[in-house]
């Protein structure tokens, strides 16, 4: 990871426990990590559209929370990378836990009656979220957050594999695409961390536009944001299929995937 900021900036000296590989205040005096900030748009705008469409289609409120949870992560991450302040770091990292808990609930409760509420997993996930929050506020160790987040992601992967193996195998392309895109982001996140010094040296020699492409933490945002969005589509497709709706994946302008859900056919 990068050392502390070597340029003065609007938000002052970083107070966060993490400072990523992008040079601080290299592009804008008002944004500490420019590319790591603007790359969060993929986690902010598309999920807002998804939440609105979910409401229009009259679907369960849990999926509105799922979409808005991803938006909350994007907004928090924007604030964190823009400022590199500790409070904004928490605004990024804690919603990652909370939103992933919503994802877990949606996916593990997708084969239940419509509008059913299972309070047991809600209580378990709530206790998990509170416990992680309390421990992380006292023990400011990023690896703890990363392990807890990874645990939730592992739960989602296992459940997804079960669904596409034993229940709806035709959803494998959507599920595996989501997982592959997410893991590509995770790979670049690790490269950015491990080879930070090499990347920073290379950027000094490359044209600015080319150097921007090597901002692998920004690519982590883009790919994991897309992977998480596709996971919501997979979860929603699974749920609405079980409820006898007629979900279809369509592409806005032939590029961006969305779910269109038609009501069950009337006999």
Q: Where do the protein language model's features map onto the residues?
A:
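Multi-pass alpha-helical transmembrane bundles in non-GPCR membrane proteins
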Residues: 2-267
